[in-house]
Amino acid sequence: MGRKKISIAPITDDRSRSVTFVKRKQGLYKKAYELAVLADCEVAVTVIDRKGRLHVFCSSDYQRTLQQLNTLSIYELKNRSHFSSSPVEESSTVSPETTTGSFTPLNNKHLKSQDQPLSDSQLDTGDSPATSETTVQDYNPQVQSYCRPEPLSSNHVRSCPPFPPTQHHHPHTRPPHHPPHPHFHNNNYPPPYCFQSPVSPGATVPLQHHSPYPSDNGFPGHRRQTHFAPYYYPQRATSPSLKQVPTYLGTHVLQQDQSTYDQKVLMPPASYLSSPNQYTLKNVSPGNPACPPFLYEHPNPQLTPEMFDVKQGSPIPPTAYSGSSCETSQHTIANTPFLAYDRSPSLTNQEAESSFQDVASISPHSLSDVKY
């Protein structure tokens, strides 16, 4: 004997009504799940009981399904891409009112008496918000700008190595991150000093000199003398072929461009002004490879290069002096950090001689043979 067919009518008994609600609700959820799996669709079931409690079942995301229910008609959902392998695109915003049950009415008249779908004139057409290629291309320049390396600025300053250690230098004062230079032990070439060219003629910039001699406490160290020397270029206005001085002068620059830069020679000590016959410069002959072509300038126009020659008389009026290699053996090197101590005329002869002796021992121009 089969099951008794229940008449479709409201149930008055509360207990029977609650049992029927639970059983039929689970059966409805089961049918919705089977439909979603078999037909590859999205099914959402919303049930509100007599007491106002909400019961929800959805085969996928419930919020996304409700948003599609508010924005799309029935046959617009058929043309969506969720029937393919790609997932359905979500809308930009989800209204919080979708969970309260404020839904728009659907055009489902064809479900009542028609098996065939509606015609195109009966359907609400609209453009699907598919992702276009132009939207993706708009982000490509921004991504490439982030991945592109930044170029170096024109104000980039090249760093220079410190003054090289000497034989009587303390072993703990040697910088551990600077390997010894191959030209440090060669007396014919100076260490790679760093010279900075001025911005304009006549500018005054500080020059620093590190001397590898014992400091005031008796221990080996660097004694730094800072002085200001004016840069003056008398040949720049008359000689257009003179190249601009680079911001640094290393050993490799000196070896490559020995015929490029002009030379002016070292400044005499202060005691030379009172007794010039005591000093004689030797072993500085033309073409001597021991004198690389440094570029120095004249700080005082009244002091001419002929002051170093003892046999010549009083100073000659100032003119422009230049030379390559060691042609100007009798010239004075001005604007160098080596004779910064002898610029004060208040020094005694003994102090000036001792200072000039220290300078001659470290000069890159082989001034170790200076006699007094």
Swiss-Prot record:
Compartmental location: Nucleus
A Gene Ontology cellular-component term: nuclear envelope
Single GO BP term: positive regulation of transcription by RNA polymerase II
Pfam family, one: SRF-TF
Keyword Transcription carried by entry: yes
Function: Acts in transcription regulation. May bind to a MEF2-like typee II promoter sequence.
Comp. bias regions, Low complexity: 84-100
DNA-binding in keyword set: yes
Keywords: DNA-binding, Nucleus, Transcription, Transcription regulation
Region (Disordered): 81-187
Name of this protein: MADS-box transcription factor pvg4
Polar residues bias locations: 114-145
Biased composition (Basic residues): 167-184
Molecular function, one GO term: RNA polymerase II cis-regulatory region sequence-specific DNA binding
SMART domains per record: MADS
Domain of life (superkingdom): Eukaryota
SUPFAM superfamilies in the cross-refs: SRF-like
